[in-house]
Amino acid sequence: MTIIVASLFLPYTPQFEADVTNSDTAKLVESSMIKVDCNNQELSNNKQERSSSVTSASSHYIGLPQEAQINGEPLQRANVGSPATGVNYHNEMEMLSSEQFLEELTANATHAANSGIPPANNPVSSGSTAQRPSVEEFFSAPSARVCSPSQEASASSISASRSSAHHNDLSSSLMKNPNLSFDSHPPRVRSSSKSAVITPVSKSVPDVDPAVVDVAKVREEFQQQASLPSMKRVSGSTAGDSSIASSSSNLRYSQQFQDNFIEDTDSEDDIDSDLETDATKKYNVPKFGGYSNNAKLRASLMRNSYELFKHLPWTIVDSDKGNGSLKNAVNIAVAEKTVKEPVSWVGTMGIPTDELPHEVCHKISKKLEQDFSSFPVVTDDITFKGAYKNYAKQILWPTLHYQIPDNPNSKAFEDHSWDYYQKVNQKFSDRIVSVYKPGDTIWIHDYHLMLVPQMVREKLPKAKIGFFLHVSFPSSEVFRCLANRERILEGIIGANFVGFQTKEYKRHFLQTCNRLLAADVSNDEVKYHCNIVSVMYAPIGIDYYHLTSQLRNGSVLEWRQLIKERWRNKKLIVCRDQFDRIRGLQKKMLAYERFLIENPEYIEKVVLIQICIGKSSDPEYERQIMVVVDRINSLSSNISISQPVVFLHQDLDFAQYLALNCEADVFLVDALREGMNLTCHEFIVSSFEKNAPLLLSEFTGSSSVLKEGAILINPWDINHVAQSIKRSLEMSPEEKRRRWKKLFKSVIEHDSDNWITKCFEYINNAWESNQETSTVFNLAPEKFCADYKASKKHLFIFKISEPPTSRMLSLLSELSSNNIVYVLSSFTKNTFESLYNGVLNIGLIAENGAYVRVNGSWYNIVEELDWMKEVAKIFDEKVERLPGSYYKIADSMIRFHTENADDQDRVPTVIGEAITHINTLFDDRDIHAYVHKDIVFVQQTGLALAAAEFLMKFYNSGVSPTDNSRISLSRTSSSMSVGNNKKHFQNQVDFVCVSGSTSPIIEPLFKLVKQEVEKNNLKFGYTILYGSSRSTYAKEHINGVNELFTILHDLTAA
């Protein structure tokens, strides 16, 4: 048996390497048909080291070549390639225009102004000498002369790089060379100085209006244009020609973006992926032709591209994309034998595949399958980007985080991107089905693959399937804004088990299924179309032991010393967030500003270090934040000595990040909405010495796990956050220690190992429960008659919803003459008696178990009726909103009918709202609303089961019930157990038959009979289902009620 883990990206990816001195390669680079990554061993090592963090986020760095910075030499265009050919090799951001440079320069002006703090962007120098510049300057005091533990730099070089002259010349030097070419994507592994890691370039999604254009046809045309190879975007100026540059601009934010999307750092790192470039941006095509328009040349380049990737050496390396927390948890569980079964992965390779020859793709796939147990899902680039970048990132992700897309064109955009999303999900489903073997467990992850569970279920109805959503799940009011909401929900509940990070997300999902699908839900189950889906929550965590070993690393210890020197006698508030609106960056800065204004004595004593990772696609939001940052820093009397805010729009090396956590006096998370923020867990483990307080937004999933020790804050309450900052800085050591112990205990209890164990336990239990309810055999009439004759005391309970026919009345009369026979229905007592008044000895169970007639007398099973007036008021409102609908009030239940409603399209919405309202309002009173055969029933729960237990107790004990009372029964004890008295055993019921079509009313009776047989309290038990059902506790099946009465006729005639 194998565990099949399906995630968007595989944990491994192919890496190609090319000789940069080759002339054919040079032509392809100039044509922008491939992407070249320059060598940077240090950053690749950093990615490997960050395996224990939530994501393995790499960064974009923009700055100066280190030699030019240190020696003060004139800046020249950075050339990578053969000196003989003089070819320039460019990365994704091939050129920086003056406009873009001013944007980057201004973005880093906040900390560049400090003589001890360089710009937060990293240069990539020419050739193989690329290094991350001046990182130690950021962490070191101006007077310090300590080398970075992660770089081999001479003392003189470091000293020179810290000189004030260098910083004075920095801006002027860059201003003189605004079109400098910078590389931004270092490779994972260092190659020789004459080689480079290259990646094929993906096509962009067609920008069409689906209302007037056949999207499928346009996409097909895009894919078939072999003479028009995919091109890299050019930013600012044309590639390869320094004489052509875009005009300068004094405006820092001049570029406008139509669509803003929010990055998902909790789930994946998509910074270094060509597949994930913004599909809404247009190519910057040079005027008057610019690039060659020669079709033969393009075709030749395309052939060269295929030939290049056909012969290039490649290897499989660890991927830095995807859900880092998932990969870490699975790998650790496998290594520690928590998971004993072999694990296979299903996902995409993480690189564009359209430019790769088919045979190369096939070889890579075989290598991944055979050596890495990874099964690639290969789809064309346009479909992948349409599904991931357009639908998942710009529709699903914002909506799941309460940021509903409100662009006027979003509806059309959503419609055509939904088509891509379905296609990618179908690809995943097909791949999983091809890999699956009986007995395997399928575990599907996150919002990219919400349709996969149901797609797999259609092909593999008996498979064991789990689904886990790593991000938040919103309330039904928000989720219902999605156009394809029902399809998504039905896709998710194709799984046996659905998991969430918190109890709140689980509750939202249950309410949404109840409201939008009119599904019957309980505290931890969804019942829909005869399927029962387990819904639980299990917060993910980190591996404490692995992180602790990294904290003892020599580099971390040295960085800690540098940080202490750099900010001696300062209080450090550390923050690390993805750069997007839901992280609450602006509100955080406003709260910090309020704190400093109200407590000016802290201006020279506190430094807030804000680390932002990920791309910024929202210039206006960045401008708003930087305005506040500049305002805060202006509070300082001397910004070169005391800078209240250090704003870094880049990630740090993992060793630096851990060191900063260790030295932090406060860790602040002010997100407006977020899933499980594992940076909090990393901080808690890192702060084992200082026991620093954690300020945590109550709107994060982490707050449900860490609420005992964290200081919970409302990011919308600026004043409260400001007060909480002061409280945390002034907290006594005793309170710090007490709070930290609680936080640390939560981290240990909710670690990655516990998460894996819980999830598989839930998946297995849910599957086993479904197996019990899905094994139904056709009733064998001969055995049924034989067991009937072999027993002495018989109890029959028939659930009959329709008025009886004369044949049914005749057979029931004959059967009840020698047996105990009861009919169960939703009819009222008066209606029931009028229908069955011709059958003298028959017993009746009215209103689904609320009342039982024994020997001509009625007995109450129902206990509570005072809720009915409140429910009637709710239905009054629904009847007004839905003309033609009506409701009926019985003695113990209310039924809401919509079959005559004028607007049938609104019926599901109104029913869903009514059910959600009632079940939420009466959740603690055992009053439940459910839909059966398009009628909404509202009644006390468990009445039919209580009635059955009442009858078994009565007929087994021989005790006459007291009028208008209920025989007391314990639900945990057997309702049929009567002790060891042999004589008394002879008088108890030894044959029970319960029959009817599946419904929430009769299923508990099926389960009861099954349990009594298993406990040997009942000799013969038959649970007979008629009609169709895929999930039931019944063990025998017949075609319909007519077949049932035919068998009863044979039984009585025998």
Curated annotation (Swiss-Prot):
The keyword Phosphoprotein applies. SUPFAM superfamilies: HAD-like, UDP-Glycosyltransferase/glycogen phosphorylase. The modification Phosphothreonine is found at residue 265. Residues 235-249 have a biased composition (Low complexity). Gene3D superfamilies: Glycogen Phosphorylase B. It is found in: Cytoplasm. One of its GO terms (biological process) is trehalose biosynthetic process. Residues 287-778 are annotated as: Glycosyltransferase. Its main location: cytoplasm. Induction: Repressed by glucose. PANTHER family: TREHALOSE SYNTHASE COMPLEX REGULATORY SUBUNIT TPS3-RELATED, TREHALOSE-6-PHOSPHATE SYNTHASE. Present with 13500 molecules/cell in log phase SD medium. This is Trehalose synthase complex regulatory subunit TPS3. The lineage of its organism: Eukaryota, Fungi, Dikarya, Ascomycota, Saccharomycotina.
